[in-house]
Amino acid sequence: MSATYNFCAGPAMLPQAVMEKAQSELLDWNGLGTSVMEISHRSKEFIALTEQAEIDLRELMSIPSNYHVLFMHGGGRGQFSAVVNNFLGNNGKALYLVDGSWSSAAVDEAKKLAGETQIDTLNIVEKDGATSRVSIPNLKELDQDYRYLHYCPNETVDGIEIFEELDSPWPIVADMSSNIMSREIDVSRYGLIYAGAQKNIGPSGLSIVIVKDELLQLPQLPQSSIMDYRLGVKHGSMYNTPPTFAWYLAAEVFKWLKSSGGVGEVQKANERKAGTLYQFIDSCDFYENRVAVENRSVMNVTFYLKDEALNDEFIKQAKAVGLVALKGHRSVGGMRASIYNAMPLEGVEKLVEFMTDFANKNRA
């Protein structure tokens, strides 16, 4: 059977080696005669798994010792609520930078919980014709006392990525659901990083939270216990039963990342994949990208057929040759190739080959 390359924005493809290992030990994990899905989350075997997973994640991201790592329920949207409830209190204010669909969704959730007056927003995307470009003002010139600044450095729907480290006078909260461990970052510049697992970490149902200890002293709003960071830290992410199979797969992905040379080597591979695809799009008059070069996402490459009447045929023919989930988000249309860490270069090369052939056959 020929290879199928899954370009879904999430849940996304997992590394082949991880999938094969999970398959091989699905019914008998660690010599226990049972699946990892069937054992107690408080068993010594599973505790050992979770401890090693945290060690590996800390090593991969160079997480300082004054940061806690939580493995939580809820995905990214769950963290939209958790951030507000854990940090804002009754009288605090927060600033949200808006650069696309997911940062907008975070704003909506924050305003629902805290009210309009506690949440300020700043749109940082400018339009130059059809091209989107990020423009971030000098944040230190804003005369406000915010509990935190929230932003999403990679917008999957819009294909926009912010590569610069923000210079913020307030603690930075970053939604890295779609670009965590895709490139090296300085964790110490952030107050909190959260990420839904289903793009670069594992299957859906799990979220990772990396939080600086001092932020846990901020006033809280009433909230559910399972989304309380303080309780999560106190109970080692096991105040309630965690999503154990997702945690297990995340642990295997961390091992795979280490065996691949770590985040630095994965970053080089990601840049090569994205560069291959963007270079082709820019050189072909049949397709176009609508994001400024300096803000083009390495993880989510959006592109448009100049004759959009061919969209359905493009998707149909791509699927027939093993290139699936290329349809763009319904809110923006076009196409989207999500090329997260697990996507091999061969998948991108096959996509470019198909796009070349499709363009040659369908030019007017």
From Swiss-Prot:
Enzyme class: transferase
Source organism, top-level taxon: Bacteria
EC numbers: 2.6.1.52
Record: residues binding L-glutamate: R42
UniProt pathway: Amino-acid biosynthesis; L-serine biosynthesis; L-serine from 3-phospho-D-glycerate: step 2/3; Cofactor biosynthesis; pyridoxine 5'-phosphate biosynthesis; pyridoxine 5'-phosphate from D-erythrose 4-phosphate: step 3/5
UniProt xrefs under HAMAP family: SerC_aminotrans_5
Quaternary data: Homodimer.
Purpose: Catalyzes the reversible conversion of 3-phosphohydroxypyruvate to phosphoserine and of 3-hydroxy-2-oxo-4-phosphonooxybutanoate to phosphohydroxythreonine.
Protein name in the entry: Phosphoserine aminotransferase
Annotated source species: Shewanella woodyi (strain ATCC 51908 / MS32)
Gene field: serC
